[in-house]
């Protein structure tokens, strides 16, 4: 009985781990190719940054109920993405000097790492990621069926 209990716990943890690795890779690879399509090139660090952003956006439902208006999830998601982008930019562009991107020529930028135009550009992507993540979790991992409230 004792061994069976730990076996079940390990299997639950492995399912959780595999699910999150799959979702992380989907978002990281997708963002990497979006950037290649948009800029013509990318950097491997963007795969990690995109994976982290997608993972965090997908887990917003763990902190907010389904009754939370969708626009609030998008607003919080945008702030989260900006924070992750800033930290990633600080590490790869300022500390490591890899010069992956530079927004210093764009208006309303913060140390050339984040800027208002891209904060606005992220909104449709955040919208898509939240919905995609919810449905992937529903279809592939048998989690709760998504339902949204636009306004409350």
Task: Locate the predicted segments by residue.
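Aromatic-rich, lipid-facing transmembrane alpha helices and their immediate juxtamembrane interface loops
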Residues: 2-152
């Amino acid at each position: 009985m004792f061994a069976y209990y730990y076996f079940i716990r390990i299997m639950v943890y492995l399912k959780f781990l595999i699910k999150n690795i799959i979702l992380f890779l989907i978002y990281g690879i997708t963002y990497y190719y979006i950037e290649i399509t948009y800029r013509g090139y990318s950097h491997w660090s963007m795969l990690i940054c995109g994976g982290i952003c997608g993972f965090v956006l997908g887990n917003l439902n763990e902190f907010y109920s389904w009754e939370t208006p969708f626009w609030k999830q998008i607003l919080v998601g945008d702030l989260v993405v900006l924070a992750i982008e800033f930290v990633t930019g600080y590490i790869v562009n300022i500390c490591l000097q890899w010069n992956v991107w530079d927004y210093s020529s764009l208006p309303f930028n913060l140390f050339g790492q984040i800027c208002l135009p891209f904060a606005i550009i992220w909104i449709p992507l955040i919208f898509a990621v939240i919905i995609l993540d919810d449905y992937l979790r529903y279809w592939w991992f048998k989690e709760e069926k998504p339902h949204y409230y636009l306004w409350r």
